[in-house]
Swiss-Prot record:
Belongs to the lin-52 family. GO terms for biological process: regulation of DNA-templated transcription. InterPro entries: DREAM_LIN52 (IPR018737). This is Protein lin-52 homolog. GO terms for cellular component: DRM complex. Component of the DREAM complex.
Length: 112
């Protein structure tokens, strides 16, 4: 049976301090070419100012993002289904109103 100290020696002998960087594209090819350069081009979000799209958000928008981020997958899918149903219903309503406008000749250009 092995002594308790042998496990630590074995573990120490298995450690490797070799740096596995992408210096050799033949040994370590990128799975998606260009991703490393793309990721390196962005500054750390901690040190840089917020992105342009976030500067335009209001508090209600941020609260909605936090709420959506806290939903489970099933709840998020239910929310998406509800939004799809609402968009479909709005499309039907718009179609009805456009047909109504056509029958009432509201959309015709006036004749000169």
């Amino acid at each position: 049976m092995a002594a308790p100290g042998d496990g630590a020696d074995l573990e120490a002998s298995l450690l490797s301090f070799e740096k596995l960087d992408r210096a050799s594209p033949d040994l370590w090819p990128e799975q998606l070419p260009g991703v490393a350069e793309f990721a390196a081009s962005f500054k750390s979000p901690i040190t840089s100012s917020p992105p342009k799209w976030m500067a335009e958000l209001e508090n209600d928008d941020i609260d909605m993002l936090k709420e959506l981020g806290s939903l489970t997958t099933a709840n998020l899918m239910e929310k998406v289904r509800g939004l799809q149903n609402l968009a479909y219903q709005l499309g039907l309503d718009e179609s009805r109103e456009m047909t109504r406008g056509k029958f009432l000749n509201i959309l015709e250009k006036p004749k000169k």
